[in-house]
């Protein structure tokens, strides 16, 4: 049971070449703050995160976004088998509405947008794989 709760290094995009190969493709979907890309690999699902200082100046905010994204992906990793998924922050958060990373609205906003993007990405993966159900 503990193995299914892990998020090992093998489930992450780590090298510049791995990120570049996914970035070369057109983005699948966008939300107000995030963009998601995907690339078929035929191997286990892997996640890459690009959360730059330009859009989230404080480290605590970047870490919150990464933590939420990793957890959302980890729980749905089987749906993305054979694909590299890259999630990129592309817009700043409104500092007046969300003054700190500890603010509940920021966590709720990020979690909601990430969940929405992963839902869309899962449908896209299923469509491109020939509409195979995730349970197979």
From Swiss-Prot:
EC number of this enzyme: 3.1.26.5
GO CC terms: ribonuclease P complex
Gene name, Swiss-Prot/TrEMBL: rnpA
Family, similarity comment: Belongs to the RnpA family.
Reactions listed under catalytic activity: Endonucleolytic cleavage of RNA, removing 5'-extranucleotides from tRNA precursor
PROSITE patterns per UniProt: RIBONUCLEASE_P
Reported function: RNaseP catalyzes the removal of the 5'-leader sequence from pre-tRNA to produce the mature 5'-terminus. It can also cleave other RNA substrates such as 4.5S RNA. The protein component plays an auxiliary but essential role in vivo by binding to the 5'-leader sequence and broadening the substrate specificity of the ribozyme.
Record protein name field: Ribonuclease P protein component
């Amino acid at each position: 049971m503990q193995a299914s709760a892990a998020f090992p290094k093998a489930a992450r995009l780590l090298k510049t070449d791995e990120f570049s190969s996914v970035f070369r493709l057109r983005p699948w979907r966008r939300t107000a703050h995030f963009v998601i890309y995907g690339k078929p690999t035929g191997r286990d699902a892997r996640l890459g995160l690009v959360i730059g200082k330009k859009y989230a100046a404080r480290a605590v905010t970047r870490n919150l976004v990464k933590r939420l994204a990793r957890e959302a992906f980890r729980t749905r990793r089987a749906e993305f088998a054979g694909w590299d998924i890259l999630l990129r922050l592309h817009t700043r958060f409104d500092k007046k509405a969300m003054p700190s990373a500890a603010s509940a609205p920021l966590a709720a906003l990020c979690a909601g947008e990430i969940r929405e993007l992963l839902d869309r990405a899962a449908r896209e993966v299923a469509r491109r794989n020939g509409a195979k159900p995730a349970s197979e």
